[in-house]
Amino acid sequence: MTDHKKLERVLKATANRRRFNILAHLKKEKELTVGEISEHINLSFKSTSRHLSLLFAADLVEKTQRSSEVFYRLGDNLHPTVLEILKHV
């Protein structure tokens, strides 16, 4: 994938206020379950899960399954643009 395509995908994923809030919470908390994230952003579990799927597809978050719960954290290789934006939250 070209750098321009990747940047476009990243910017589209972060352009949504709810997804941006998810990234901001993950920056502070390091790792959260879908349920914990949905409580933080006042959104249903299902909608939160959908937003997390989009962030995962854009390589902005990583997930780990432990027992019956999925834990999300910021990706290790975040795009420099996202890192710069997250410095200000």
Q: What are the residue ranges of the model-derived segments?
A:
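Short, Lys/Arg-enriched N-terminal segment that forms or immediately precedes the first helix
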Residues: 1-11
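Short alpha-helical elements of helix-turn-helix
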Residues: 13-23, 80
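Short capping segments at the starts of secondary-structure elements
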Residues: 17-20, 29-33
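A short acidic, leucine-rich amphipathic alpha-helix
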Residues: 36-38
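Key DNA-contact positions within bacterial/archaeal DNA-binding proteins
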Residues: 46
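Short, hydrophobic-biased segments on the C-terminal half of alpha helices
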Residues: 52-53
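Beta-hairpin "wing" of winged helix-turn-helix
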Residues: 56-66, 73
